[in-house]
Amino acid sequence: MIGTKWPSEKHTFLDPVSGQPVTQLTDQYLNFHLYFTDNSFDPSCENIYFQSNRCNPEAERCQLFRMNLESGEMEQLTDDPAGIMQAQVTKTKDGKLIAYFTGKELRLYNTETRENTLLYEEKGDFILSNLFFSCDSKKIGFTRNEDRDTIPDGGPNYLGFKEKMFAIKDGRVSVINVDGSDFHDVLRDTHWISHFQYSPDDPAIAMFCHEGPWNYVQQRIWVINMETGDFRPCFRQSEEDCVGHEFWSEGGDIIFDNRRDGHDGTISSSGTQVFAEETGSGRTPYFGFAHKDGTVYRKIDMPFYCNHYYANADLSLFVGDAVKDIVLISIDENGGTKLTTLARHNTTWKYQRSHCHPNFSWDGKKILYSADTDDTHDNIFLVEVPKELL
């Protein structure tokens, strides 16, 4: 029920690998923070928004919650019958507005007034996904892909992921004003479209991806003008590139992970890839840094196997989720890298919700990540960045 408050479940322990204090914020049910391209923290860094099935533990029907990090108290904010799927929540940087998908509805929640409004209802045979606010908080962009699933994507160990890539021939980038007006498609494509993200400093610019195993996708990242519909590739890929998990830096540049040939961008519960054997050339993976026009202006070798990376505000420190550990990667002025283990996460990697998706707090002092232990427990963890790395 909306407004229900849950007592603190948090407790702190010393990580067995790094010795760093780690605070486990939840210890019951399924819980996970927002997708790594969004930030779960409010501007004060005193509260986080997250999803949980604690109000419906017999199913994976999750709702939206807010937690005060000092007290650990949690409050339920939504109670939609269809629930909210993982990674289908986004919010404005100031934390005032939250948008999410439930079933075929796009809804808007105002954290100040607590008003919850229906903005859009899908009437066609499309699946809604990947929503994101423009930086001026006036529009919400999202993807709509034809519902052609023979095997539903999102199962264990990327079940249905490759099949969905081949099946979808109608993918769209759509937009709507936050008052519910002027819904329209900006782009219609012949590929599964995903990972839509507005630029953090230009409300007209966004990026999206052609989704699928990285070794099957010919061109992953695209930059689009949301006012004109013009789009262009970001970093023109060659046969030896396997690119993905792109995100915007706070300064408005695009950062992407190029693992080179032989990598599909997945990880399974066995700790290995799903769709590719590691038979590539042995070329060193790297981070690419690109401007909004898609041109790459910097590359930094990144010889570490992490599944997702994210950067702090000044790009001096990256966080990643390696097979077993949450790691920090510091970058010096010459592009040199140094890896520091922050915590052993022990996640199973079985489901998308098992992925750690680590991210920084807005002030860059804390790392938030999720990890599971079995099919019915998924928890959220908080760890401070060591002072010597700040």
Where are the language model's segments positioned?
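Short, conserved, GDST-rich strand-edge loop motifs in beta-rich repeat architectures
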Residues: 2-4, 52-60, 143-168, 209-218, ...
